[in-house]
Amino acid sequence: MTIKLIVGLANPGAEYAATRHNAGAWFVDLLAERLRAPLREEAKFFGYTSRVTLGGEDVRLLVPTTFMNLSGKAVAAMASFFRINPDEILVAHDELDLPPGVAKLKLGGGHGGHNGLKDIISKLGNNPNFHRLRIGIGHPGDKNKVVGFVLGKPPVSEQKLIDEAIDEAARCTEMWFTDGLTKATNRLHAFKAQ
C-alpha cells in the first residue's frame, strides 16, 4: 500500500492563513518546500497542487481552495481523476484532542466533528478509510468556544510547538516511503515538542 495523494486541509484566503484550522495546509506547504515542488493553483482540482516523488513513487500534494466544509469536492476530484483509492490518501488536519507539539498518524475512524473530514468521508462515498495526520492544536476547554478557537491564531509559544510537530511529521512522512508506515508512526508518536 502506498500513499498517492497527500492533502492539507484549510480555509482559503489571507484572513485564515495563520489560523489553527489551517494546520493541515501548513504541513503540505512545508512538504512542498522540503521537496522543492511549489504548489500551483489548478481549477479542475479546486485547490493548489504539486507532484512529488517520494521513495520512487509519484505522489500528488493538494491544498483545497474550497472552504473547509467543502474539502471533499477537491479530494474527490483528484482521487477520481488519478484513480486513487481512499486508503492511498493521507489527509493532514488540525486536531483538538492532541496538544500543540504532538502529531499522530491513524487510518480510518470518524470525523470527530471536523467539518473537513466529514465532507471528505461523504464525497468518497461514505468511506472513512483514508489515513489521517492529526496535528495537535489543543482544546479551548469548552465546546462552545471551539469555533472561535480553531478560527483563531495560536500565540507564538503554541505556534512554535505546532511548527516543530509539523516539521517532525514531514520527516516521518518521507520516512514512511523509505522505511515503512510502522517505523514512521513509531518515530512520530514518540515525538513531543518542548
From Swiss-Prot:
Q: Which residues form the active site?
A: H21
Subunit details: Monomer.
| NCBIfam families attached to this UniProt entry | pth
Q: What is its main location?
A: cytoplasm
In the record, what terms sit under GO molecular function?
peptidyl-tRNA hydrolase activity; tRNA binding
- Name the InterPro entries on file: Pept_tRNA_hydro, Pept_tRNA_hydro_CS, Pept_tRNA_hydro_sf
Q: Please state where this protein is localized.
A: Cytoplasm
Q: What is this protein called?
A: Peptidyl-tRNA hydrolase
Which UniProt keywords are given for this protein, alphabetically ordered?
Cytoplasm, Hydrolase, RNA-binding, tRNA-binding
What function is annotated for this protein?
A: Hydrolyzes ribosome-free peptidyl-tRNAs (with 1 or more amino acids incorporated), which drop off the ribosome during protein synthesis, or as a result of ribosome stalling.
EC number(s) for this protein?
3.1.1.29
Provide the reaction this enzyme catalyses: an N-acyl-L-alpha-aminoacyl-tRNA + H2O = an N-acyl-L-amino acid + a tRNA + H(+)
Give the matching PANTHER family.
PEPTIDYL-TRNA HYDROLASE (PTHR17224:SF1)
| One Gene Ontology CC term in the entry | cytoplasm
Which residue numbers mark the site Discriminates between blocked and unblocked aminoacyl-tRNA? N11
Site described as Stabilizes the basic form of H active site to accept a proton, located at: D94
What positions does the entry give for tRNA binding?
Y16, F67, N69, N115
> Broadest EC class?
hydrolase
Picking any one GO biological process from the record gives: protein quality control for misfolded or incompletely synthesized proteins
Family according to the record: Belongs to the PTH family.
- Report the HAMAP family cross-referenced here: Pept_tRNA_hydro_bact (MF_00083)
Q: Kindly give the PROSITE patterns that the UniProt entry links to this protein.
A: PEPT_TRNA_HYDROL_1 (PS01195), PEPT_TRNA_HYDROL_2 (PS01196)
Supply the gene name. Answer: pth
